[in-house]
Amino acid sequence: MTELFIDGAWRDGAGPVFASRNPGTGEPVWEGAGASADDVERAVASARRAFAAWSALDLDARCAIVKRFAALLVERKEALATMIGRETGKPLWEARTEVASMAAKVDVSIAAYHERTGERRSPTADGVAVLRHRPHGVVAVFGPYNFPGHLPNGHIVPALIAGNTVVFKPSELAPGVARATVEIWRDAGLPAGVLNLVQGEKDTGVALANHRQIDGLFFTGSSDTGTLLHRQFGGRPEIVLALEMGGNNPLVVADVEDIDAAVHHAIQSAFLSAGQRCTCARRILVPRGAFGDRFLERFADVASRITADVYDADPQPFMGAVISARAASRLVAAQAKLLELGAAPIIEMRQRDPALGFVNASILDVTPVRELPDEEHFGPLAQIVRYTDLDDAIARANDTAFGLSAGLLADDETVWNTFRRAIRAGIVNWNRPTNGASSAAPFGGAGRSGNHRPSAYYAADYCAYPMASVESAQLQMPANLSPGLHF
């Protein structure tokens, strides 16, 4: 099967054969040969050849192609959503939302380019000062499996608008979504070599990351892999590296009047996308006392009735399967470790079928655990931490090396103002789920959640570098010479 897209054509890979499966049914979705090191070499060379013409193309012409891509996404929304659902297990309602987000990203990215990296002119005494922005060159984009369309799209779209060319290495767990997306780019009229697709597993990613002819690498994925990339590019300041990684995110619940609203936002924060969003709440901090007890009782009641089913089930479930049976078993193992450390089960996670990715939403009270591991468990595993007062809640919330998202559910704005000033995270929400983020704002975190290159609206910043010029249309001698010069 021809599954690599290099220099505007579909090609056979020379690497190992691998496959993706629907985690909710086990059925095969995609199979093909990955890219070998030689295939990666050809992809990078193709992007390098295409760079001069693409970057020289008028910005409006580049944007016209990108807008055509958005229009085709709308036309093919159902087909792409179905592929996302089949390959990731997420319900169709959520897959459709992902495709809609991909299309909406285009106008937002164009606006961000003009606002953050456009051209500025200001008069000076001797001419005009001009600020322009230039593309880096060839950039590698590494995509994750949880949003296999939307998240790499958040790097690719602004990179292309800025004039870069791209080599895209998707997750080996979602190659079918990547192929379908690249087909849409091809049909939108993107010139040959501007976007290249190299499918593959770890060896393909290593070959691309190690290539000496890339000018940048944009990564979304785990903190462990991102940290390895950061070490790898140490001593290479010429490479622009943008890392979007995970978090051990806290949601603090205060004593609120509308307990059902608090429970709803906690459910969304912890269990949306089966807990497979990097902004999901991993720790839910609940006050000690009667209110906290009532909240936990209601939270457990609603969580116990969350439906999980195949992507196209009717009626639609809230959750689908996690990405694989292996991921499901790792979550159950993580729960077992926490129980061994002294956590008290409120709802225990169980894997429905060892061959599939279905697990239920689970809740553990980890307050008794003396040394709680600072880890991101990428699934529907909510850890409850009881606190005494706001200072205690903030201290516990900040007790992490990560800093992606955090949230507060509270009626009192004074409490919110105290919280937002003290919390250490890049996305901090009040009376909204932790995984709610605006595309018109930056998306990124502090600590081990990234390397201070936020994406979304600020992706324009790492897709181009500033070029400052002082210009005069006429060459002439200055009115006054510097001391010691004689003409």
UniProtKB/Swiss-Prot annotation:
It comes from Burkholderia pseudomallei (strain K96243). This is N-succinylglutamate 5-semialdehyde dehydrogenase. The keyword NAD applies. The keyword NAD applies. Pathway: Amino-acid degradation; L-arginine degradation via AST pathway; L-glutamate and succinate from L-arginine: step 4/5. Keywords: Arginine metabolism, NAD, Oxidoreductase. It catalyses: N-succinyl-L-glutamate 5-semialdehyde + NAD(+) + H2O = N-succinyl-L-glutamate + NADH + 2 H(+). GO terms for molecular function: succinylglutamate-semialdehyde dehydrogenase activity. Its EC number is 1.2.1.71. It is an enzyme of class 1 (oxidoreductase). One of its GO terms (biological process) is arginine catabolic process to glutamate. HAMAP family: Aldedh_AstD. Catalyzes the NAD-dependent reduction of succinylglutamate semialdehyde into succinylglutamate. It comes from the Bacteria. NAD(+) binds at G221, S222, S223, D224, T225, G226. The active site is at E244, C278. Belongs to the aldehyde dehydrogenase family. AstD subfamily. It holds the Pfam family Aldedh. SUPFAM superfamilies: ALDH-like.
